[in-house]
């Protein structure tokens, strides 16, 4: 059994850890509010831009469709972008994204597809490099950025555009964590190329179907400009969702750690009191026995 001094040191150590986890929880909560506001503010812009592209795409057919919209006509070469965190202590936040990406990667490899990977965040890079080091073509460390803007997303979009225009990839898919609430963040796969123009954007396109528009310049020329911008915006929106999800996961993880530390302190304190009481009782018995012997 540990001595009383060792038990006191253990209790003090856990209390110090509890103070750290509590402070980290409060910091994560403050950053979560800012990150959540930024993510929610970016979504309407991203949705509206996608809706504009859907409306324009409805008037483009055949060979006039830009490459980012029409695609290459093949799906043999895939680029998987895995956006996760640069820091840890956030529960299973990064692991859930990497797990979803790995499932897609393994499926594509089993189908004989050529798979390339772009990693965003040191944690995703560390996990995927152990498994697919020969498939990673680029990795991005965003730990130096406190806020994500278009200037952060642009270099990532440039790499995607370069690989696509060089004919190295046919399909580009981004894996990230969709922020829904503090307790719900869902690993999500978003196809970036060929650009998707249906689904959530269909109602917006349908509303414009009743009117006939004449565009100057043409729809094709406008799309040639908007599609690269849309690529950057969709990546930025995913990064902002990721940041909010990371701080939500970290806040939850630190809250759980603080509670667990409290439980450990109670348990260690109880053990300490019992040991101290037993030691006092033993000393009293020795004193009484000695007095009776005299």
Curated annotation (Swiss-Prot):
Task: Give the protein's recorded name.
Answer: ATP synthase gamma chain
Q: Which GO terms describe its molecular function?
A: ATP binding; proton-transporting ATP synthase activity, rotational mechanism
**What gene name does this entry carry?**
atpG
Q: What is its main location?
A: membrane
What protein family does this chain belong to? Belongs to the ATPase gamma chain family.
One Pfam annotation reads: ATP-synt
List the InterPro entries.
Answer: ATP_synth_F1_ATPase_gsu, ATP_synth_F1_gsu, ATP_synth_F1_gsu_CS
Q: Which UniProt keywords apply?
A: ATP synthesis, Cell inner membrane, Cell membrane, CF(1), Hydrogen ion transport, Ion transport, Membrane, Transport
| Species of provenance | Caulobacter sp. (strain K31)
The record describes its membrane topology as: Peripheral membrane protein
Subcellular location as annotated: Cell inner membrane
